[in-house]
């Protein structure tokens, strides 16, 4: 006797997106692509798998992502260490270097797709999640930093989102961070007895991240620590002032957060996050900043760059809360039929209506009119096209309007098949 196969479930933290929610995703992505194209950004697509050394070099060996969160394995064919991308920026920069994109001119590019981190799943934090990654490669001034932030403000408005606030900081340049790092280590050494395990681990490897602690017991100590902003030179301050002035000009509100450092080592100068209190502990909807050294660090010709990433699942959650999401209909027209001749005619009518640009579902199989109408209503279609023996004989169709916005809910007309498409289009 064959043993019953135990059904397979999705991996914890890696979620299926079923037809209803998937329609929301498609609508959301249409809005996002139109928004990005409105600012001149063009799509790039990079592989999910990259060489591990791209991320250890680009993100930083002592970051949480590299130390604890990457899905890494050895390729059995050549022994190469490969990693499923935990973020997109490093891969986009690798592609720009490999294909000599920056030798001719700067580029505005974006990617949308899945990324992977080995984390403990919870609301807003998954092992496979999706990002909108936006990069301005080859741009140096504070104007582009501000434009990216203003762009995001426009997206929130388009989606009807409120309660998202902007936090800003400057990480300065490497020499300024080195001076601050020395002062910070000296300060933290005086408080080593109260540091938690994460703090002690990061004390000499990544002391800035100690200040980003979520441990309430360390907040007072972190608040009194030396501030990086006090170590910034004239050029770094001028760049940050330029960003703030342009945000003021655009009417974008913000707060300065001296402890905002981001979780990736490649940032310098401007860093920012858009955060909300409406998603529980996972309140960061979008984060980004400037990374002028990353292109050179990964083997390219030195070039400035700035970008951001949006967490799609978190933003969709926020959008749903704001009632911005309405389930799109499965089709505009649902064709119901009774009898073999009507079923065959329905297939031809469906194709004719699609030729006219309408989305159409032709009921599959045999069923009563009652059950077909029930299915038509559930589909969200605005009209039902009804075909029976009489319609076949007279080359007509009965049209029943199912929605209040479709020429009168419940009304029914008789329409010649030759003019059916134009009638439905005119009443759309």
Curated annotation (Swiss-Prot):
InterPro entries: aa-tRNA-synth_II, aa-tRNA-synth_II/BPL/LPL, Anticodon-bd, Anticodon-bd_dom_sf, His-tRNA-ligase, HisRS-like_core, HisRS/HisZ, HisRS_anticodon. Keywords: Aminoacyl-tRNA synthetase, ATP-binding, Cytoplasm, Ligase, Nucleotide-binding, Protein biosynthesis. Its EC number is 6.1.1.21. One of its GO terms (cellular component) is cytoplasm. GO terms for biological process: histidyl-tRNA aminoacylation. It is an enzyme of class 6 (ligase). Homodimer. This is Histidine--tRNA ligase. It comes from Bordetella avium (strain 197N).
